[in-house]
A protein has these predicted regions:
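Structural core segment of the AMP-binding/adenylate-forming
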Residues: 21, 56, 60-61, 88-165
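Conserved pre-ATP/AMP-binding loop-to-beta segment of ANL
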Residues: 30, 142, 166-186, 193, ...
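Conserved AMP-binding/adenylation subdomain of ANL enzymes
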Residues: 205-229, 237-276, 291
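Flexible, low-complexity linker/hinge segments
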Residues: 7-16, 128, 149-181
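Conserved structural elements of the adenylate-forming
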Residues: 48-54, 165, 197-226, 233, ...
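Conserved AMP-binding A3 loop
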Residues: 43-45, 182-209
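Conserved AMP-binding/adenylate-forming core of the ANL superfamily
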Residues: 32-84, 101-106, 161
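Gly/Ser/Thr-rich phosphate-binding loop
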Residues: 250, 272-280, 289-358, 371, ...
Length: 399
């Protein structure tokens, strides 16, 4: 796009937009790998090309700024491409929770007014059953791991890889208003129908910067830095996998995407790709640790942030006995989500393992730029003494 010419002394209003997160990895680590299961390996350089191709392909399908593109996909490099291409165009990415009932999926897609659906072939039967009820959807793009189109009566307008192959490698991503809506998803933590949540480019970038500092700057256990190998184990449809794919991309780390969560595949990838950093809910950690495939697996390099529900002390101890570093993070869908992390302070690192367990399973302390207070019914602050009960109130620049 044509850049604005600034007059001498005129300040430049630098927009906090998602495309800026790709700048540094393309300078520092353009040839570092992004891996999908045991099927695909690309570099950051190729990732950037594919993001540009996807934006061009979606444009050919009629996607315009302000439109909504819905994704039904497992954790993959393709989902990561959607994380950048769709918002970068000025459109909105809807990350569809395919675990919802068919009725709730219809409600959320219609409520979001999705124009295009990008769907993994695994979900074709689900989509086929509800397609006639999706009143705003005009186009369907099929994702297939083997590049083949399965037989389906569903009208499919393009296959993902074919769409990219037929598209140019350069798209002129605009300098959007940073308050442009980037993503939307629906939370079921309420009564009635799922409630929509959305985040702007500014909110996502600020959350990314804050959590990057929280997990990388402090001398503590579950650090994530540029020499780590990252694998999400929280679905990318759920609050952008807690925002960590954006963090991993900003840092330019090697990324490993497991697709469908299968213990054998996850453990295979952890060992083969030397994964060092993940995040998940307690049930996923337990699924992995109790899998027969975990018996002889070396998990001693693995660091895992746990959220979504309370981490049982026994499960934390089981993980540590396998050499895994674990701690807890806290947040909500509406907070993007991370608000606090149970990073032990430096002096706590010298404590014995049993004493440290009592620290890492707690909610933790606020991450940088997050203000958190406990208040009484009159909104008066209460002491942070580990005993007093009140209502949690919070404020951040991305809320």
């Amino acid at each position: 796009m044509t850049e604005k010419a600034y007059a001498p002394g005129e300040s430049y209003a630098y927009p906090l937009i998602l495309k800026k997160l790709l700048t540094i990895p393309l300078i520092y680590s353009p040839d570092r790998e992004i891996v999908y299961r045991d099927k695909t390996r690309i570099t950051y350089r190729t990732l950037n090309e594919r993001i540009n191709r996807l934006a061009n392909g979606l444009t050919r399908l009629g996607v315009k700024p302000g439109d909504v593109v819905a994704a039904f996909e497992f954790d993959s490099h393709r989902y990561l491409e959607c994380f950048f291409a769709v918002p970068g165009m000025g459109a909105t990415l809807q990350t569809v929770n395919w675990r919802l009932s068919p009725e709730q999926i219809v409600y959320t897609v219609n409520h979001a007014e999705a124009k295009v659906i990008i769907v993994n072939a695994f979900f074709l039967q689900l989509l086929q059953a509800v397609r006639d009820k999706l009143t705003t959807v005009k186009k369907v793009v099929l994702i297939s791991d083997d590049g083949k189109k399965p037989e389906t009566p569903l009208a499919v307008d393009a296959e993902y890889e074919e769409l990219l192959a037929a598209s140019e490698t350069r798209y002129d991503f605009p300098d959007l208003d940073e308050n442009t809506r980037a993503t939307t998803f629906y939370t079921t933590g309420t009564t009635g129908n799922p409630k929509g949540v959305f985040f702007s480019h500014r909110q996502l970038v600020l959350h990314t910067l804050s959590v990057t500092a929280a997990v990388g700057a402090y001398h503590t256990q579950c650090r994530c830095r540029s020499d780590d190998v990252y694998m999400p184990l929280t679905p990318m449809f759920h609050v952008h996998a807690w925002g960590f794919p954006y963090i991993a991309t900003l840092l330019g780390v090697k990324q490993v995407y497991p697709g469908m969560y299968e213990p054998g595949m996850i453990l295979k990838l952890i060992q083969a790709e030397k994964v060092t950093f993940s995040h998940c809910v307690p049930t996923i950690l337990q699924m992995i640790l109790t899998s027969p495939a975990a018996k002889d697996a070396d998990l001693s390099r693995w660091k895992v942030i746990i959220g979504g529900s309370q981490l049982p002390r026994g499960l934390a101890k089981m993980a540590r006995e396998r050499g895994i570093e674990v701690n807890v993070g806290y947040g909500m869908s509406e907070t993007c989500p991370v608000i606090s992390l149970a990073n032990p302070k430096e002096h706590m690192l010298a404590w014995d393992a049993e004493r440290q367990l009592d620290v890492v399973i707690k909610t933790g302390r606020p991450i940088p730029l997050a203000d958190v207070e406990i208040v009484d019914p009159l909104d008066a602050p209460l002491p942070h003494d580990g005993k007093t009960v009140g209502e949690v109130v919070m404020r951040t620049p991305w809320l």
